[in-house]
Amino acid sequence: DSRGKAIHKYFRESSFHYVEKKIKKLSRKDMTTQSIYLQIALTKLNELDFEQRVMRQVKSEHKAVDKSTITKSIMLITKCLMDKAIFSDDKSDVNWIGVFAGGESENATWQVRPLDNYLYEGLPGVAIFFAALNKIFSDDKYNQILEGISKALFTYTDEMYLRQRGSENESSGVFCGEASLLYTYEILYQLTSEEKYITYSKKQIEVVSKIVNSDQYFDIIYGNAGALLAILNMYKVFPEKKYLEMAISIGDSLIEKQEKNGGWKGKTSANELAGFSHGASGISYALYRLWHLTKEKKYCVSAKRGFLFENSLYDAQEGNW
């Protein structure tokens, strides 16, 4: 302890024996998996030879797909997730090892790590999948995974809710930010009708409220446009004045940050971007949703300016933006 006194029999086994026991459980399958992870981790993205082509037109022929084919595909995805799930000893916690691109473009590498707590590349998306799966096919093992993920997400929200400092450094977006958990809880409530997801929606929106004033991205993925959409969804379910006021505050901030040409320049962008994920059309869509609710003309005007900027980047010859 802090006074240098040894506390005997605190741990059930020594660190050495724990590691030894873990090694004895490993199989050839584990060796193959670890070899793949090592190979991926040591490979730089720019060492791979990609053929870059401009797709001028995509032709798709609609083919009718029967229910059995859809079900078969769903079950293949489910089996893959179930096979690769990593559970705690008591099965109350679960996660997966994912592969993600990281680093600057010139020195980008693959990162091998557990899924994070955001929707874009983390546990929330898997939770939504298993919630929908359990609603349709009703199986205890699907619900067990949903409960395990929910436990991890609730723990994260509780920690963020109680955090006094540092929250302003987090992203606010609806896919790679704190609003992604709010959006996830909203969806999980719709799928399960369980009140605990409403409880945590109300906690998470308080977390989001501490972050939105520091946003420097503005977009759907990382920034306040995404947060705005999640908050508008919350207001639709619970029309409390404070949620509307939060949405209006974000909308006003987005208008204030809009450039003269109608676009938005995020923290890491040299220029104003186009597109729904990081660019003007996504931000404009969020503002349009706010206008549809409030009927405040300024949000509609700002959204139109954003769409006009987006369309100014269209290249008719390439058939693309």
For each feature predicted by the language model, list its residue ranges.
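Regulatory N- and C-terminal appendages and interdomain linkers associated
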Residues: 1-121, 125, 129, 163-173
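Well-ordered alpha-helical scaffold segments within catalytic/enzyme domains
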Residues: 58-64, 124-139, 180-194, 228-240, ...
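Extended, well-ordered alpha-helical scaffold segments
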Residues: 66-84, 138-158, 193-211, 239-257, ...
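Glycine- and aromatic-rich loop/turn segments at beta-sheet edges
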Residues: 84-112, 154-172, 204-222, 255-274, ...
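Glycine-centered tight-turn and secondary-structure capping sites
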Residues: 118-125, 174-180, 223, 279-282
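Helix-terminus loop motifs that line ligand-binding clefts
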Residues: 140-184
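Short, conserved phosphate-binding/catalytic loop or strand-edge motifs used
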Residues: 177-181, 202-208, 222-229
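Solenoidal tandem-repeat scaffolds enriched in leucines and small polar residues
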Residues: 218-301
